[in-house]
Amino acid sequence: MYKRQGLGEPLCWIAFGPLATAAALIVISPKSNFDAIPWGTALIVGAGPAMATTLVLFCSHFHQINQDAAVGKKSPLVVLGTNRAANFLPWLVGLIFLLELLPVLNGVWPITTLMCLISLPSGLDLIKLIKRHHNKPELIKNSKFSALRFQTINGLCLSIGFATSYFFL
């Protein structure tokens, strides 16, 4: 019933963002209080990394947009087309960094989490690849791996930033 409706990316963000982060926060909480799910904290902590995960799904469809459209899928790429999706990609990568920068600027995250900026060159490489070859399936078929590289570096550096913040207090 809900297949092929273009809900994969939003559901991916919700599942890997607020839901997964809220579950992790509940598990590490010193008290078991399931009545007070920390949705605000989960949203702040999980939004950027979840958007990076969603980016992998978004980029995995560039090479198969014609096949997706032929079977009636309404993925964001089918709806936007490859050119508009390629032009949207820099905004998506920028949003990831914004979602990871705002908690630092607001004093919620330690400054060491800015290590996530190390992933910027990988994000720029992904943007260049897709902008240059968005309509050439044979050249873009590995874009999901470039997106995965960005997501991995971004998440790893963010995690290291959180882990090392203790040493810089």
Predicted regions mapped to residue ranges:
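Solvent-exposed interhelical
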Residues: 50-94
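Juxtamembrane boundary at the C-terminal end of a transmembrane helix
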Residues: 160-169
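Core segments of transmembrane alpha-helices
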Residues: 12-22, 86-101, 152-158
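Membrane-embedded alpha-helical segments that form the functional core of polytopic membrane enzymes
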Residues: 35-59
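Intramembrane alpha-helical segments
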Residues: 2-33
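Interfacial loop-to-transmembrane junctions
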Residues: 11, 126-155
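Transmembrane helix-loop-helix
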Residues: 37-41, 91-138
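C-terminal ends of transmembrane helices
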Residues: 3-5, 57, 61, 65-66, ...
